[in-house]
Amino acid sequence: MDPQQWLLLEVSLEAIQHAGLVPGQSLARDTGVFIGISTDDYKASQLYSSDLSRIGTYTGSGCMYSAAAGRLSYWLGLQGPNKAVDTACSSSLVALHDACQAIRHGECSTALVGGVNLLLTPHLFVCFSALGALSPDGVCRAFADGANGYVRGEGCGVLVLKSRAQAEADGDQILALIAATAVNQDGTSSNLTAPNGAAQQQVMRTALQRAGVSAAQVGYVETHGTGTSF
């Protein structure tokens, strides 16, 4: 089984416990699961290996993105919407947006939202190096004159989401509020993998408008970028 699936199970249980919830009891059965996942190193090493003896009964389900999300609902007995999201670097944020929409539309009362990324083989490193996307000296200098590429990273994170009204009614500890989310796409840019500044500005304006917040009120910004002159 893809270690990313193992990690999601472990971190999801940690998130549920940290939220003071118990699967099968206080964790609602209609809880949705939304997982951002876009790296398939383990799948490539198992299913696409020339050694077919490495493929077993559960290799397929152990490698599928859909199973990374589905396994959580299976083990936790959850019957809300379930989806794995692959939008490359934005996968977990788009999963978060989808979860917020599902809660707002009454599709689930609670949502597990997560993202996972493990780097298990050299193949994508070679690909991104050929593309010129990786920093040759292993340092990401986003927004700096000397920016020469980004650095890949690993990790896993899971959040437990509810509407504010539901969380307050349940007496939950609220760590943060999501004022609004927004999603769009670059459309046409200089090339397929290059960002479109105008489109990115528009999605931020949309999120601010939905939240009823002005740009001047924002005190902290966390961004994702290419770490290059783009």
Predicted feature locations:
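Condensing-enzyme catalytic core of the thiolase-fold
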Residues: 1-230
